[in-house]
Amino acid sequence: MEDAGEDPTTFAAHSLPSDPRLLATVTNAYLGTRVFHDTLHVSGVYNGAGGDTHRAMLPSPLNVRLEAPAGMGEQLTETFALDTNTGSFLHTLEGPRFRASQCIYAHRTLPHVLAFRVSIARLAPGSGPITLLLRSAFSPESPDLDLHQGPDFQGARYLYGHTLTPEQPGGPQQEVHMLWTPAPPDLTLGEGEEARTWDFLTAVGGSQAEAQACLTEALQLQARGALYTAHAQAWAQLWVECGLDVVGPLQLRQALRGSLYYLLSALPQPKAPGYICHGLSPGGLSNGSREECYWGHVFWDQDLWMFPSILMFHPEAARAILEYRIRTLDGALENAQNLGYQGAKFAWESADSGLEVCPEDIYGVQEVHVNGAVVLAFELYYHTTQDLQLFREAGGWDVVRAVAEFWCSRVEWSPREEKYHLRGVMSPDEYHSGVNNSVYTNVLVQNSLRFAAALAQDLGLPIPSQWLAVADKIKVPFDVEQNFHPEFDGYEPGEVVKQADVVLLGYPVPFSLSPDVRRKNLEIYEAVTSPQGPAMTWSMFAVGWMELKDAVRARGLLDRSFANMAEPFKVWTENADGSGAVNFLTGMGGFLQAVVFGCTGFRVTRAGVTFDPVCLSGISRVSVSGIFYQGNKLNFSFSEDSVTVEVTARAGPWAPHLEAELWPSQSRLSLLPGHKVSFPRSAGRIQMSPPKLPGSSSSEFPGRTFSDVRDPLQSPLWVTLGSSSPTESLTVDPASE
C-alpha cells in the first residue's frame, strides 16, 4: 500500500539526532543496543540489590563508526537509515569514486549474535586502493560486571565475568561470556578490486560453551555467505506473516510500521526453540542501565499495553510472557505475605526474582492494579488460544488462583454500604495516592475474580464462594446525578489526572457501559488529563471515541497518540517533551492497540473476536494481516463500504473452522480456508463454526476445544493456504441471506 510513492518501511536521514537517546535500536529476544552506543544489554542479566537492580552494562563491540579519512578530497553524501524490512541500520558514505556502507543488526535467527558488516564498492573507473576508517571506542570494562579477558577463540577476542551484586541476598551472580571479532582501524578496497565486504561478529552467552557454540554457528553461516541473508530473510518472512497498514497519511503509516517493528524486535522469531522470556520493560532491551528507562524493570506496561497486540500476531511469544509471570510467582507470593495478605501480589517493578524492586515503597504497596493487568493478559490468551495446557500443567492456574486469593484478602466489608471496599490504593493516575475504591482497580478485581471462577469451572475445579461474592459486591463508584464514574471515592470533576485511567473501562478492561456513560467518562477526563502524561494515554481516548462512532474526535486523538514519536528513526519518548523512557514500547503498544483494536473494533471474548470497524477521515482502508485465533491465521481489512476476511493458514486439522456472524442480521458466513469473504461494513463476531452433525465428514473434534486434542502452540504445523492457486473470493450481501 504505497502512498504517493513514499516508502513507509525505511526511515532515512542525512544526519543523526542531536539527542543520542533517540538513535535507532537493534535488538532481538536476547541482546539489545542502540546504534553507535558503548553499551549492550543481555536479557535477564541484572546487577544491583533490591531497588537498585538494573540491566547490567556490557561493553559493545558494535560501537564502531565508519568514516572517510581527512583529505580524501571527495564530496561525500552521508545517509543513515533504519530498514524495518530487514531489521538493519545502514550508514552509507557515497562519492564519485565509491560507495561505502555499514550495516548493523541483531541477528533474527541467532539471538545470541550481534553483527555489523562493512561494504566498499567502486563506482568509477580506476584501480587505486580506497581506504575507509573505523572509529571505535571499545573498552573491556563495565561498572556492573567483574570482567576478565580470556584466550582467543577462532580469531575472536574473549571477555567473561559475572555481575557484582545479586538482586536478593544470596541470589545468583549471573555469568556473561562474550566473543567478538575486533574491528581494525581501517579497511581498504585493494587495487583492482571492484567490491568487498567484511563481517564483524559478537556472540554472547551464559557460559563459555554457549558463546563458543553461537559464534561457531555464525561463522559457518558467514563462510557460506549466508549470515546476513538468513537474518534478512527471517525478517522478510515475519512481515509476510503479520502486518498492519492503512491507506492514509505517510506519517501515520510510518508510525504504525515503526511501532510494530520495535515491538517485534523484542520478540523471538516464531517457532524459535528454547526461548525464555525475562519480561518486557518500557524502554526495551536496548535501554535500562542504572538510572535509565526505569532500570529495565518490568511493569504493568508489559501486560496491559504491549501484550494485546503481541497476542494477536505472535501467540507463542504471548505465552512466553505469561510464563515469565508464572516463573516469578514465588516472588509475588512473598510480596503479598510481606504486606500481610494472602495469595500473590505481583511487583509494581519486577526484575529476575519477581520480588518488588521499585525504589519507592509507595508504588509497590499501592499500585495493586498490576495484578488485574496480569490476570487480564492470561484471560485474553485463554480466549484466543484455548490453551488449557498452560493452565492445567504449566502453572497458569496457580497465577490466576493466587491473584483471586489476594483480592479476597485485600478487600474490606463496609456494613454501611453493604459493599466490599478496596482502600489505600493508587490507580494509573499517580497524581492521587492512598485513595479508596479506585473504579479502575475495582473493576479489574471483578474481572479477575469472574475469570478465575470461569476458568476453575473449565478445569473441573471447585470455585470458592468468596470469589463471586466479592466480584458481585465490590463497590464500583458511580455518580448517578452526573452520569459518570468518579475515579475514586471523593473525586471531584475538574481535578487533574495524570493519564488514562477511568477511560480504560470498556477497553482494554472488559466492562459494560452505556453509550451515554462512556461518552461522559471520555468528556470529563479528556478535559482534565495532563498534557505532560505518558504516551499511551491518548490512544485510549481515541479507542473510546471510535466505540461511540465519533470519527472526528477519534481521528484527532489518534494523531495525538503518536505525537511522542521522534524523528528520524521513529523512536518514542515517554512524555511529549521528550523526557522519560525512550524507545518507549509502552506508548507504541497503546498506539498499536488504537488501530488493531480501535479502528477494527476487535474485542477478544469468550465467544469469539467481535469486530465493529470505524472509518476515520483521511484513512480509506485499514488492513491487519496474520491475526491468530484458535489455531487459524486471518487477514482482516475494511474500507468505507466493505469488510474482507480471509483465513490464510491453519495450525493443523485440530484447529476449528471459523465463521463470521454479522450483526444485526445474524447472518453467518463460513470462513473457508483459502477463500476471501467480503460483506458490507458492519459489526459482527469471528467465532468457531458449530460442530458438524453426526455422521458428516469433518476433521474437527465436536464438543472439544482444540487444546484438548493438541497443545496449539507446541510446534504448530502451520499449513498455508491458497499458495498454489489464486485465492478465491466470495462477496456476500447479508440482506440476501
Swiss-Prot record:
Positions contributing to substrate binding: W300, D301, K498, Q499
Effect listed in the UniProt record for changing D429N: Significantly impairs catalytic activity
Database matches in InterPro entries: 6-hairpin_glycosidase_sf (IPR008928), 6hp_glycosidase-like_sf (IPR012341), Glyco_hydro_65_M (IPR005195)
Domain of life: Eukaryota
Gene Ontology molecular-function annotations: protein-glucosylgalactosylhydroxylysine glucosidase activity
Gene Ontology terms: biological process: carbohydrate metabolic process
Catalysed reactions listed for this entry: (5R)-5-O-[alpha-D-glucosyl-(1->2)-beta-D-galactosyl]-5-hydroxy-L-lysyl-[collagen] + H2O = (5R)-5-O-(beta-D-galactosyl)-5-hydroxy-L-lysyl-[collagen] + D-glucose
Keywords: Glycosidase, Hydrolase
Outcome, altering D429E: Abolishes catalytic activity
Active site (UniProt): E430
Residue runs in coiled coils: none
Enzyme's top EC category: hydrolase
Family: Belongs to the glycosyl hydrolase 65 family.
Record protein name field: Protein-glucosylgalactosylhydroxylysine glucosidase
Natural source organism: Homo sapiens
Gene name of this polypeptide: PGGHG
